[in-house]
Amino acid sequence: MKLNQLITATAAIALTASIAQAGRLVIKGSDTLGAKLVPQLAEAYKAQNPATKFEIAAEGSTTGIAAIIENTAQIGMSSRRAKATEISAASAKGIAMKPTVVAFDAMGVIVNSANPITSLTKKQVEQIFTGDVTDWSAVGGKPGKISIYTRNTSSGTYSDWKELAMKKRDYAGSAQKMAGHEQIAAEVGKNASGIGYVGLAYMKAGGIKVIGIDGVVPTAATVKNKTFPYSRPTFYYTSGDPSGEAKGFVDFTLSPKGQAICSQVGFVPVN
C-alpha cells in the first residue's frame, strides 16, 4: 500500500472510532428537524440514557447526507431524499445509505399578519416565487413590491419547494436566502410585504399568518389525507442499518413516546 493510501485509511479508521465511541451520538443535517424536534427528542432520550452525549448540528439536509458519506456523523437529518449523485458518492465509498422516515411535514406559505391575503392558488405561488409576479396587487392584495424569503441552497426545504411549488423552475433573483425556518418567519413578521415558507413546527411565530393554498391550509389532518399540496416526509439517514447509540435513538424516535414528541413539536407522526 502506498504511503498516502495508508494515511487515508488510517485517518478513516480513526474517524470511525471517533464518532462511534461509546455514549457519543453525532447528528448533523436538516434545520427542519434539527432546530426544534431532534433536540427535544435528544433531551427525552437522554433522560432514559443519561450517559449519552449528543452533538447536533442543524445546517441543512445537504450537510447531513454529506456527513454520512464522509463518516462524520452517525445520523444525517434530511427533509429531502438523497440525490442520485449522493447515493453514488456513498456507494463509491462502500456506504449503503439507509433512509428512515421519522415524521411528515408540510411547507406552509406565510405572509405578514397585516397582509389582507388569506389564500393563493398553486399557480399564484409559483408565479410569486419564480418572479413572474412581483406586486401584491396582481394576486388580490394591496399594491406593493413582494419580498420573497427562502431557505438557502444547502437546505432540503429549498429543493423540495422548487419541486413541489415551482415546477422545478428557478427562484426569483430577488429572493433572499435564510439559514433556517425561524429566520424566514422573523423576516416575514417584520416586513408587511414579505412572503416565505416554513414547516409546521414554525407556523406559530409572531407577526405572521399561514395562508391557504386553493383554500386548503396546512394541518396534521390535511397532511394525512394528502389534500395539502406541499407535504413531504422527513428522514434520518444512516450508513446501512443503524447500530449502537444511533439504533437506540432511531428506535426511540419511532416509538410511541418519540412520535408523541414529534406531534407536540408540530410534525405529523408516521404511525
For each feature predicted by the language model, list its residue ranges.
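Bacterial N-terminal signal peptides that target proteins for export
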Residues: M1-T8
